[in-house]
């Protein structure tokens, strides 16, 4: 990465100290990745949201797309699953800070180690697991690669409480649109 732009939505009644702390955390992460923040955009919103739009370059042989998976490839996950489920539960006070903290720590962790390992292993295809979850993103990758996959569900790394929360129907809003997809 070379440069990043902040994208912050925050209730203005929280004051500038909260915004400053969030933006400083983002700047620290961007610096850790070897880039700098050149600006961004903020909006007043009841629900806090923060992200970065990151710009950079990569060598052609280091670009891995979500198409190109081949029969026999293994699926590697670099972080546990269940971020959306656990954060949805936190928003409605169904879990405590002790269950939320590992999720926050994971979201703050850079993906650089996984990226380097993926390139070194000459990975055929990759995807991120974000709003559409593993099912949605894996489906997209497999469809683009004209492949199928067998998942050993019990071996999937999950955040504490994620499975029980899912069974209790505490799921992020996108869950059911992913099922329709």
Where are these regions (language model features)?
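Short acidic/polar active-site loop segments enriched in Thr and Asp
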Residues: 1-2, 124
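Glycine-rich anion-binding loops of enzyme active sites
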Residues: 2-96
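Asparagine-centered polar/low-complexity signal
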Residues: 6, 111, 178-181
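Glycine-/charge-enriched secondary-structure boundary and capping motifs
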Residues: 13-36, 43-50, 120-121, 126-181
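Glycine- and other small-residue-rich loops at beta-strand/loop junctions that grip anionic moieties
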Residues: 41, 67, 78, 103, ...
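Active-site glycine-rich loop that binds ribose-phosphate moieties when present
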Residues: 53-63, 98-118
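Short hydrophobic/aromatic-rich motifs at helix boundaries and adjacent loops
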Residues: 84-88, 107-112, 135
